[in-house]
Amino acid sequence: MDEKGRSLKNNNMEDEMDLKRGPWTAEEDFKLMNYIATNGEGRWNSLSRCAGLQRTGKSCRLRWLNYLRPDVRRGNITLEEQLLILELHSRWGNRWSKIAQYLPGRTDNEIKNYWRTRVQKHAKQLKCDVNSQQFKDTMKYLWMPRLVERIQSASASSAAAATTTTTTTTGSAGTSSCITTSNNQFMNYDYNNNNMGQQFGVMSNNDYITPENSSVAVSPASDLTEYYSAPNPNPEYYSGQMGNSYYPDQNLVSSQLLPDNYFDYSGLLDEDLTAMQEQSNLSWFENINGAASSSDSLWNIGETDEEFWFLQQQQQFNNNGSF
């Protein structure tokens, strides 16, 4: 009997020495999934040997239930799931497997980890026991209603974002229509001006620049230069950039035809105009950036900090005996 017992003990020790520990490999995952797809779940100790895995039955079961099962959900626990966990835990306590039945795709181990890392952490920060009546009341009357508010707010934000997307799409189509109409009006205006010039004997140029045949982007400064015929401080630069573009002769423009509030741009070089524009843009950007920074600092509160603040306020309220 002693020899037989020793042989069985030695065999068990040899089996334990052959077992693998540590992370699973992709090859092991494939073997486990392939075997379960063919033979089903259950009898995990025999399943491990039949599948050719040097793992314990418990290791195979946990690997399948927590990671390889097709319906296992990934990612953070949602607000709705958090609310359901708090509600079910208030009824059944630490019965994680039973709670997991009401959260499809979530494992009992994942729910237990959420409870220990989030709920117990808040209780510790509030310096009270997680199983105390005070903390249970805090969850029931403050934390859970707060979750409901956040769920409703997130739903409203999603609906508003969907409405904004629809409006933006419609507005883009309208903008394209307006641009097309504007281009047509511009062409008609240019055609009428050429006809009027022919009637009154004024020279016209068929190479007049339009948005269609120009290779230079249109800007407000170029418009002012074209219509008011400012003196050219650098003739070589403008002649190289504008090519065959037409500029009216300055001698043909009489000072009597200019309006009284006409500003003489001849005294401003391109450097002055550029400096004025950059200063204006810089002031505008600083104002906007300053407002955004103050707003961000005001609302930059983490989710955990916000929840902890509410729970702390509730605890102070309870300590004063007004709860």
UniProtKB/Swiss-Prot annotation:
<keyword id="KW-0539">Nucleus</keyword>
<dbReference type="GO" id="GO:0005634">
    <property type="term" value="C:nucleus"/>
</dbReference>
<comment type="subunit">
    <text>Interacts with BOI, but not with BRG1.</text>
</comment>
<dbReference type="InterPro" id="IPR009057">
    <property type="entry name" value="Homeodomain-like_sf"/>
</dbReference>
<comment type="function">
    <text>Transcription factor contributing to the regulation of stamen maturation and male fertility in response to jasmonate signaling. Required for correct timing of anther dehiscence. Acts as a negative regulator of abscisic acid-induced cell death. Not involved in the regulation of BOI. Regulated by MYB21 and at a lower level by MYB24. Negatively regulated by the proteasome in an SCF(COI1) E3 ubiquitin-protein ligase complex-dependent manner.</text>
</comment>
<keyword id="KW-0804">Transcription</keyword>
<dbReference type="InterPro" id="IPR017930">
    <property type="entry name" value="Myb_dom"/>
</dbReference>
<dbReference type="GO" id="GO:0006952">
    <property type="term" value="P:defense response"/>
</dbReference>
<keyword id="KW-0832">Ubl conjugation</keyword>
<feature type="domain" description="HTH myb-type 1">
    <location>
        <begin position="16"/>
        <end position="68"/>
    </location>
</feature>
<feature type="domain" description="HTH myb-type 2">
    <location>
        <begin position="69"/>
        <end position="123"/>
    </location>
</feature>
<feature type="DNA-binding region" description="H-T-H motif">
    <location>
        <begin position="44"/>
        <end position="68"/>
    </location>
</feature>
<dbReference type="GO" id="GO:0009620">
    <property type="term" value="P:response to fungus"/>
</dbReference>
<dbReference type="GO" id="GO:0003700">
    <property type="term" value="F:DNA-binding transcription factor activity"/>
</dbReference>
<dbReference type="GO" id="GO:0000976">
    <property type="term" value="F:transcription cis-regulatory region binding"/>
</dbReference>
<feature type="DNA-binding region" description="H-T-H motif">
    <location>
        <begin position="96"/>
        <end position="119"/>
    </location>
</feature>
<dbReference type="InterPro" id="IPR001005">
    <property type="entry name" value="SANT/Myb"/>
</dbReference>
<protein>
    <recommendedName>
        <fullName>Transcription factor MYB108</fullName>
    </recommendedName>
</protein>
<keyword id="KW-0611">Plant defense</keyword>
<dbReference type="GO" id="GO:0120195">
    <property type="term" value="P:positive regulation of anther dehiscence"/>
</dbReference>
<dbReference type="InterPro" id="IPR044676">
    <property type="entry name" value="EOBI/EOBII-like_plant"/>
</dbReference>
<keyword id="KW-0238">DNA-binding</keyword>
<dbReference type="Pfam" id="PF00249">
    <property type="entry name" value="Myb_DNA-binding"/>
</dbReference>
<keyword id="KW-0677">Repeat</keyword>
<dbReference type="GO" id="GO:0008219">
    <property type="term" value="P:cell death"/>
</dbReference>
<keyword id="KW-0805">Transcription regulation</keyword>
<keyword id="KW-0010">Activator</keyword>
